[in-house]
Amino acid sequence: MYRHLSRILIAAFLLMTAVEGTWGIEMHRNPLMWAIAVLMMASLAYTIRESIIKKRSIAGILSHTGMFLVLLGSLAGAPFFVDAQVRVNPGSEVRQAFSRDGETVPLPFGISLEEFRADFYEDGVSPKQYTSRLLIDGKEFETSVNHPCRHGGYGIYQADFGSENEEYSILKLVHDPWFPIILIGLLLLAAGAIWGLKQYWDSWLALAATGITAVAFGAISLARINFGTLVPALRSLWFIPHIALYMLAYSSLALALVTAVLSGFSNQSQKMGTLSSRLFNTASSLLLLGMICGAVWAKECWGDWWTWDAKECWAAVTWLLTILGTHLPGRWRERSTMALAFIILAFAAMQLTWYGVDMLPAARSSLHTYR
């Protein structure tokens, strides 16, 4: 019974995430979404207990425990999460910031701007880095894009800056005391995904061969990126693994679709179907690893590991479709038409995530435009 409930919860969460990622309606503030998350935690707790008692796969235990901790940290930490902005001018100390709703947020310290600096590439036009030198409670700190400073329980992030005629810096201040719980959950999810990759294949050699094929497909998409003049937000150690994992995931999903279609015309349909299933599961793990890299990067860049951005939402929808496909009853997964349907849905969501999100209404305020 609980397995059917878990599938319904995943589907409901998926649909609400798709709505937010398409129209920008804040479904994550809806009490129904919170109720679904609480029920998912209960379902995960039961699954973890059953998996330990029945000695099921380690990958499953790690993944379900990780997801439980991510939801726990997000729900329990929401009342204590502070996200505010402040404008600081040279020589002028401020002790309060403002939330997204315009409410005043008192700060436990005073902060002022000593110097703002913009660095450019050799062309003199493309920005390379933005840096603010700050004075906080009499001590000097420096914050720049992807390199926040920390003081008094707050992460201080470079958010914006003034025009050429007026020097000031806009900082984002984030207080997130429950993030360590979320981070542990993300690490367990990553461990479960990596462990699962080995289970999908008979040997590391087979996995490596598939990986090389996927890399060849992924390189085609990576070739269009200009690495020479990356904007400050993209100048991060997480950029390459984040993009590479997604390219591998997308390539694996494309290969899963190709093999699933070919299985209908092959005299070795069972082998082709098994290969398609393995590729589909591999894509699911790689999508999760790509999202985790993106989440840690987002925390480093703008202070929030998940912002319900349009691109984030549709990346999650793609992953949730693969999760829903792998959580179907065995008799459904054995039907080639059902398996093909989920592969097609996930592939379509993947295409929308990669190419079509910028055309959606929710993308107007997207952080992934890097303007």
Language model features: what each stretch is:
Residues 1-371:
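Solvent-exposed, non-transmembrane regions of integral membrane proteins
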